[in-house]
Amino acid sequence: MKFVIIGGVAGGMSAATRLRRLQEDAEIVVFEKGPNVSFANCGLPYYLSGEIDEREKLLIQTPESLAARFRLDVRVDHEVTAIFPETKEVEVSHGGESRKETYDALLLSPGAKPFIPEITGLSEAKNVFTVRNVPDVDAIMEKLEEQPRKAVVIGAGFIGIEVAENLKKRGLDVTIVERTPQVVPTLDEEMASFIQKELENNDVQVLTNCAVTSFEEQGNMLRLENGEMLESDLTILSVGVQPDSRLAEMAGLTLGLRGGIVVDEHYQTSDPAIFAVGDAIVVKHQITKKPALISLASPANRQGRQAADNMAGRPRLNQGSLGTAIVRAFGQTAASTGITERQAKKAGLSFQVLHASGKDHAGYYPSATDLLLKLIFHPETGEIYGAQGIGQKGVDKRIDILATAIKGHLTVFDLPELELTYAPPFGSAKDPVNMLGYIAMNVIEGLSEMIQWHELPEELAHGKQLLDVRNKEELQKGYFPKASHIPLSELRQRLDELDKEQEYIVSCHSGLRSYLAERILKQAGFTVKNLDGAFSLYQAVRPDELCYPQG
């Protein structure tokens, strides 16, 4: 049996090594058009600042090491230029010469390529780079030797955020230009606002709702759509990726969403002898059940292994992807799994949203830091659709737990039952994940009714009254205009100051005390809802709509 794999790195090399473990006598040939068949592409931004201090650490395996350990025939700098499904051959170019190679089964793992927008003057710019492979960062490092002062990062997705952070740590003045209203478009607006604030607190200029319309002076000046000019010694394009499906298209394979390669649940393409994995394929999103493009290393590695099993006659099913991802911006971490509130609306799902604040470990233990979690779930069944987290520490742990819960088809009713490790340095007796479950149960069972931060202005305009139950000292940090104020500790004694004909919205700092106030008021006969996320969340998203004491 002869297996040919086009493309290395995550998907291709996972498949190649798995095939060898399954079939010792098989012939396995890997063609990689670049010079590196196995490298840490997710680590590339951190090499720019020196956080990863040696280039060699980015190179995971070499053709020689793979030949020695797995008896793989790995050929770098070999570009497959055509596939001939009818004869089961591929055409390979190397060193100016072309030849054909036969196969019994073929795996496509071409990955994705950076999306290059059509911008006037881009082709003449001499200082514009992408970050996709080792030669890309080699070119950027060479440019950094010229001691550039100003850098512009176009695009505020994960790669853009990581590159901006590392260029800033390198000592450059960094500006991020993002055409959408927020950074990290894969997060919901209020969660992304924490990352934008962290970038700005570290002197990274962030321009949202803004696009570059032209490069001038060979890329040293960028014109924005509002007419302003940005000076740039170094520009990074990170406006997303698109499937590198050119070979598949030339071979007549079926393509789908945005040119992604269509595969079945066994990773077979429209040609049964050709399989495909990684960033180039269309997957089924586990929540929406709709086609999706998910360019992440973890799914690509898993897909490579599963495709190898199928190619070797050991059936494995692709169960879909959640798109679980994480990014660091200086001292803050953001992570997500499943779908966002925005995606739930677009998919037409019935859903409920809640936010829960906590600490990464027991609050009384030293160095506890704030943690904010968001949950999207079905308002009746409690099915978990997605989750997001923001904080300095512990975000990865909580989102990993919630991603596992979704994969295991747990509901919000199961979250309080999770027995998670606890000691004061590591967590809390009621972990924030447990608390998400408790809060969601209260909502589903009718003990609590919530409104979201973006609904507050309209609710107030319709006559509802906001009641702030924080302490007087907390008001010195900011307060809602026209809100009533009764500290929670005084609420029971001051119920006669409230009007049972008036509908109330209660708020505190993060949501716990306002829930307690909600329960007190409801049982006293008042109509009341709880502002989800409370003052702290609203302040993060719309600080200009709040009042602050003078001085």
Give, region by region, the residue ranges found by the protein language model.
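Mid-to-C-terminal Rossmann-like scaffold of FAD/NAD(P)H-dependent oxidoreductases
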Residues: M1, G8, G12, A280-K393, ...
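Glycine-rich dinucleotide-binding loop and its adjacent helix/turn
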Residues: P110-R170, Q205-V206, V263-E265, I486-L488, ...
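Beta1-alpha1 glycine-rich phosphate/pyrophosphate-binding loop at the start
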Residues: M1-D73, F158, A164-L187, T324, ...
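FAD-site-proximal beta/loop scaffold in flavoenzymes
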Residues: E124-Q147, G219-R223, E228-Q306, I401, ...
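Rhodanese-like catalytic fold shared by cysteine-dependent sulfurtransferases
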Residues: F413-P424, S428-Q465, K472-E503, L512-G551
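Rossmann-like dinucleotide-binding cores of NAD(P)H-dependent redox enzymes
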Residues: L59, K150-A151, F158-S214, L296-A300, ...
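N-terminal Rossmann-like dinucleotide/flavin-binding domain of flavoprotein oxidoreductases
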Residues: R18-A105, D188-Q205, E341-Q343, M435, ...
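A Rossmann-like FAD-binding core segment of flavoenzymes
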Residues: D25-E27, R69, R75-H94, E101, ...
